[in-house]
Design a protein with these regions (language model features):
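Catalytic PLP-binding core of fold-type I/II PLP enzymes
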Residues: 41-73
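Active-site C-terminal subdomain of aminotransferase-like
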Residues: 25-35, 40, 78-183
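Active-site-proximal loop/turn and secondary-structure-junction residues that shape catalytic pockets
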Residues: 35, 66-68, 96, 223-225
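A general structural motif
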Residues: 24-26, 57, 214
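Alpha-helical scaffolding segments of alpha/beta enzyme cores, especially the outer helices
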Residues: 9, 44-55, 78, 82-85, ...
């Protein structure tokens, strides 16, 4: 994660440089929530970042590819309304949350709304059968009343629950976490022999080797994860 203090420092350092025209001019802060390692920005942190952006004349963009999983996490204190109040632009992820394709962009800054549709004239942005993108989100968000009762959020909530069950199984075996994630992405530091055993039957993303005898991995659940597959993994972990 980044902080409001880091943003201020970076921009102020740029503006204090007498040759700043040779650098890219800061114009926007881009963050992901959840982050790529499953951590979450709190409402207080995002409020501070938003204030720093406003003070410095920057736009704030939030990558929401995994936003549903973040919103349904037990550690989350953000709402969609908070995102709308604090960000200039954010988007609801589709492909990671059950949609066949596409994302739903939400623009809250009125200045950025003007002429946005001209984006279809850039880089092949005109999507044939584009209505099908919207139809997916109509189905995923049907009946949503702010309580997370739509398909979009119930799928994410179940994936988070499954991920935390997997995390519990690994922690009970004394496995250390690479990152403290409370979302559908979990990161573990496994003894190499355990990694070799589990890799034969389960898909894990290799995240590097923190030392000569351990391997860091990422295990993800999603809208498509079956309960029986989670139970099979948990039973395999117990037998290590």
């Amino acid at each position: 994660k980044i902080t409001a203090r880091q943003i201020r420092h970076a921009v102020e350092e740029h503006r204090a440089n007498a040759s700043h025209e040779h650098e890219v001019q800061p114009g926007m802060v881009y963050i992901s929530n959840p982050t790529e390692v499953g951590t979450l920005y709190t409402k207080a942190e995002l409020t501070d970042i938003s204030a720093a952006c406003y003070e410095l004349g920057l736009y704030l963009f939030v990558d929401g590819a995994r936003m549903a999983y973040g919103l349904m996490s037990e550690a989350n204190d953000m709402t969609l309304q908070d995102y709308a109040a604090l960000c200039d632009v954010f988007y609801l992820g589709g492909t990671k949350c059950g949609a066949l394709f596409g994302e739903a962009v939400v623009i809250t800054n009125d200045t950025l709304k003007e002429d946005f549709r001209y984006a279809i004239k850039q880089h092949g942005g005109m999507l044939a059968k584009g209505r099908l993108l919207g139809e997916q989100f109509l189905a995923l968000l049907d009946g949503e009343d702010g309580t997370g009762n739509s398909l979009y959020f119930t799928l994410a909530a179940e994936a988070d629950r499954q991920a935390m069950a997997i995390r519990k199984a690994f922690e009970e075996k004394g496995v250390k976490l690479l990152h403290d994630s409370y979302t559908n992405q979990q990161f573990f530091v496994l003894p190499d022999e355990w990694h070799e055993v589990l890799s034969k039957n389960f898909a894990m993303t290799h995240m590097g080797k923190p030392d000569k005898t351990h391997t860091a991995v990422r295990i993800c659940t999603s809208w498509a994860t079956k309960a029986e597959n989670v139970e099979t993994l948990i039973e395999a972990v117990k037998k290590l």
